[in-house]
Amino acid sequence: MKRVAFVFTHSPHGSTSGREGLDALLAMSALTEEIGVFFVGDGVLQLLPHQQPEKILMRNYIATFGVLPLYDIECCYLCEASVRQRGLSIDTNWVLDVELLAPKAWRSKLADYHSILSF
């Protein structure tokens, strides 16, 4: 069975990219069990708690990341360097259980997947 990786690279509310990626991720979970979710660059902001997108008239989809384990999606990786570059604490209570990885380890995990979809 093909292993599919979803890579989130954009901030959550500047475009619909994150929401569309999450929708695609949930749809793909019906087709394969081998899914990895990766966050790098501004994509790490997707998992910050206590966001208030309704104040800028955006839909709050961030909490939906928290239900990924219910879809048997448990391989989730966050680029530690991206977190630090944005001045965030690695001890943040992310909305999803993630494994923080150094960039080299993050790329190595991503290389294990057959298909990569970037959002």
UniProtKB/Swiss-Prot annotation:
Name by which UniProt lists this protein: Protein TusC
The organism's place on the tree of life at top rank: Bacteria
Described function: Part of a sulfur-relay system required for 2-thiolation of 5-methylaminomethyl-2-thiouridine (mnm(5)s(2)U) at tRNA wobble positions.
GO terms of biological process kind: tRNA processing
Membrane-crossing segments per the record: none
One Gene Ontology CC term in the entry: cytoplasm
Organism: Pectobacterium atrosepticum (strain SCRI 1043 / ATCC BAA-672)
Localization (cell): Cytoplasm
Keywords for this protein: Cytoplasm, tRNA processing
Major place of residence: cytoplasm
Family the UniProt entry places it in: Belongs to the DsrF/TusC family.
HAMAP family associated with the record: Thiourid_synth_C (MF_00389)
Subunit structure, as described in the record: Heterohexamer, formed by a dimer of trimers. The hexameric TusBCD complex contains 2 copies each of TusB, TusC and TusD. The TusBCD complex interacts with TusE.
